[in-house]
Amino acid sequence: QEDPDYLKLWLDSFVSSYEQFLDVDFEKLPTRVDDVPPGISLLPDNILQVLRLQLLQCVQKMSDGLEEQQQALSLLLVKFFIILCRNLANVEEIGMCSYVNHVITITTSYIQQLKSKTKEKEETDQTPIEEFVRHALVFCESLYDPYRNWRQRIAGHFLSTVERSRQKYKPASLTVMFVPFFYQCFQESEHLKESLKCCLLHLFGAIVAGGQRNALQAVSPATMEVLMRVLADCDSWDDRNPEEESRKAELTLKCLTEVVHILLTSSSDQRQVETSTILENYFKLLNSDHSALPNPKRCRQWESRFIALQIQMLNTITAMLDCTDRPVLQAIFLNSNCFEHLIRLLQNCKVFQGHLDSLAVSTIQALTAVMHKSPAAKEVFKERIGYAHIYEVLKSLGQPSRELLEELMNMAVEGDHMAVGMLGISNVQPLLLLIQWLPELESHSLQVFISNWLRRICCINRQSRATCVNANMVIRVIETLNSHSALHSSCAENLIALLGSLGSQSMSSEELLQLIRLLRTEEPDRAHPYVVPVMRSILAMARKQGMASALQYFNLKHSMAGIAVPSIHKWPGSAFSFNAWLCLDQDRVDPSMSSKSGKRKQLY
């Protein structure tokens, strides 16, 4: 305390010895080192008090501007605290002291300088100030996300609940200065470097990922306003740092995903912001009207970047719904009128010249995520929007790509459409849409590809055939075959083979009549090209294949399905029996059940 030069020398030596623990780059995972920095008890007596006074002196001199030596000392102090926090046993004690408040005060002043556009700033080297800011933000990360959960998440490593429960040390309590600091940093920040904004977003994500208590304190109306404004600022993107701009948007969306997940695990009295409010602002931004922008701003390059942002936002919806409380979040999405917003996005995107297909693919992915394994969501979509409407909207975008058609196939099986045999039909409506779209496809190769896949997925087992028959697929196929001049011969053969398989399951007299009418020609002397394949189909329907099976049966596939036997009021004896035939369909293997024990149905 009496010899500042010796103190600086000691700090230099300490920081040099443990420099590998600094890990200032948020984009990189922390360095794994066997050794750890010393605990506080092993440091010289009163060293923390001395350092606190040194920091306080720096704060007091900020108004007049720090000299070069004082700037170097303040940076050394922050590095020292980062290193100390890498010994997780020190985090709680350091967090309880006033160091972080002093550091935030200095950082706020520096960021104000970096945000300004003055001649003095342009003539002065800003590197020392930027270096301090980066280290200050990492110091805060060390306090509030000691296990670097956010960095793990950014790198694609998702920690399970069990792994999180094994984290022995808790993060320090979040300082009340953080929310005002974070909000102020993004006020009038057009001259602040995008890389520093990314660091601020990294810190926010780290606080939310570090622990629920701090997350609920950080997730406030002010911070949510900042995140939404960062996304909305895409209008002012320039050509100087497009990669950093894109990364900023990506980090903001990852922060929002983390926020939604943390809000789902909290009670209403703990939350400052409701998930529904976030989604309302999110969809409003996703569907914002940019047609009023002046033409110079709406250049082709700007359109490309804006659509890229919309695609990122759509993909984020899928990421948000990838959580343990998915049914709860799906209900919140439904209450936020997400289907209407997503369909409106497809309708409005026609103002742009290109990238329509990519946007349509991402929109279908988002719709699939909202409806995934939720009969209620599927019913809501059917009632509010309807597949006839989405068909018209998609058709208005022009000829579809293979990727878009494959996404509709994925929607039908709620998984990878190539896993035929592993996945059955979860949503039959997209299949009807694909059948209806076949005559409109100019590409014959796409017609053959789609029809061949439809034939395989719809006929894979008894359950799939029953699902398709109950959805009136037979009539839809016959209607499509009526446009035979627009269909490739192989496509027509696949559809007729599909008819034969579905007809062997069930076919009404009206459907059979429609099939026969299909063979009429305007010229009596010329046979219809479908005569031979249709006759084969009719023979396949009539032919008995395998063991005779019941024409009517109960479907007990659903986990909650069962047969209720009426209660017996008077027992004829000591017990009673209930007889039923059981048919086990072995064609379908559910991958989700492959690693689990078998299910058992009980009779109540």
Predicted regions span which residues?
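Short carbohydrate-recognition loop motifs
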Residues: M541-K557
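Elongated alpha-helical scaffolds that mediate protein-protein interactions in large eukaryotic proteins
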Residues: Q1-M535, A540, K544-G546, P591-S592
